[in-house]
């Protein structure tokens, strides 16, 4: 793998995993525009992608480190019968993780086979943009209402939204932010819950494939560099996004980008052969 391609994929993963624009969709579409085909199951590429997932997860853990310490402490306090907001949120995160975790383990590879056509991925990206626009309307409609605490049923609903991100072109963070807004969270709280909820899923995606990283010792240097670059890009991305939504940033901006990018890619692959 060339150095520029390594840097490109690392930064692309770190940014698009957290921005509501679909990391998997971008990982497939953007290289293809340059005539490159990305096979995430290729033996020479898989260890590198494992490191990218772990880099993203470590960046999220570091950014929310104080929050996670409070959540874990609150969780153990709740086990002792002491009700508290942090414990409630930790239970909500556990419940919200279940749907995507189960479906991902059972169906991820089947879903990927169905959506191997890049034109379908482009259409999914367009739909993702429309959903973000609708989510923005929900966000604005609730802007003057007091924020609500998620019930466990709502947390499950938000977690269920993560399942859609198994389809290339749909964004995990985008779908969960939309669901969080629909459940009554402010834009800032919906973003925070989305990133907290995504951390164990992203971590698990890397850890499940971790043994394959050590089965390719000749690629450890590339994987390590990629993981570090992704962690830096992911950390800067989550810091930007949290400030963006704290300042009443809107999902519609990302929705417009996804719709335009999806339309461009759809038009491109209607008239150009897909790389194999």
Curated annotation (Swiss-Prot):
E.C. number: 3.6.1.27
Membrane topology, record value: Multi-pass membrane protein
Top EC class, one word: hydrolase
Transmembrane segments: 1-21, 44-64, 87-107, 114-134, 150-170, 190-210, 222-242, 251-271
GO cellular component terms given for this protein: plasma membrane
GO biological process: cell wall organization; peptidoglycan biosynthetic process; regulation of cell shape; response to antibiotic
Catalytic activity: di-trans,octa-cis-undecaprenyl diphosphate + H2O = di-trans,octa-cis-undecaprenyl phosphate + phosphate + H(+)
GO MF annotations in UniProt: undecaprenyl-diphosphatase activity
UniProt-annotated location(s): Cell inner membrane
Keywords attached to this entry: Antibiotic resistance, Cell inner membrane, Cell membrane, Cell shape, Cell wall biogenesis/degradation, Hydrolase, Membrane, Peptidoglycan synthesis, Transmembrane, Transmembrane helix
Chief location of this protein within or outside the cell: membrane
Family of this protein: Belongs to the UppP family.
Miscellaneous field: Bacitracin is thought to be involved in the inhibition of peptidoglycan synthesis by sequestering undecaprenyl diphosphate, thereby reducing the pool of lipid carrier available.
Function (record text): Catalyzes the dephosphorylation of undecaprenyl diphosphate (UPP). Confers resistance to bacitracin.
Protein name as it appears in the record: Undecaprenyl-diphosphatase 2
Organism annotation: Burkholderia thailandensis (strain ATCC 700388 / DSM 13276 / CCUG 48851 / CIP 106301 / E264)
């Amino acid at each position: 793998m060339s150095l520029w391609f390594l840097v490109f994929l690392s930064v692309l993963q770190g940014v698009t995993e957290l921005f509501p624009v679909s990391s998997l969709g971008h990982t497939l579409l953007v290289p293809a525009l340059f005539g490159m085909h990305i096979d995430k199951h290729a033996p020479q590429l898989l260890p590198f992608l494992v490191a990218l997932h772990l880099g993203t997860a470590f960046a999220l853990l570091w950014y929310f480190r104080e929050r996670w310490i409070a959540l874990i402490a609150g969780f153990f306090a709740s086990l002792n019968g002491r009700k508290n907001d942090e414990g409630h949120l930790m239970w909500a995160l556990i419940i919200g993780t279940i749907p995507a975790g189960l479906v991902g383990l059972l169906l991820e590879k089947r879903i990927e086979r169905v959506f191997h056509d890049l034109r379908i991925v482009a259409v999914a990206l367009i739909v993702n943009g429309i959903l973000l626009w609708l989510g923005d309307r929900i966000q604005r409609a609730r802007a003057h209402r007091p924020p609500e605490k998620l019930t466990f049923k709502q947390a499950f609903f938000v977690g269920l939204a993560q399942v859609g991100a198994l389809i290339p072109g749909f964004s995990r963070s985008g779908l969960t932010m939309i669901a969080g807004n629909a459940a009554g969270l402010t834009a800032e709280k919906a973003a925070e819950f989305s990133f907290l909820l995504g951390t164990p899923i992203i971590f698990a995606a890397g850890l499940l494939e971790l043994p394959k990283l050590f089965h390719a010792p000749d690629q450890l240097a590339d994987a390590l560099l990629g993981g570090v670059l992704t962690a830096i890009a992911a950390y800067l991305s989550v810091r930007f996004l949290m400030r963006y939504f704290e300042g009443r940033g809107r999902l519609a901006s990302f929705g417009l980008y996804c719709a335009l990018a999806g339309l461009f890619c759809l038009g491109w692959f209607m008239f150009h052969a897909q790389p194999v």
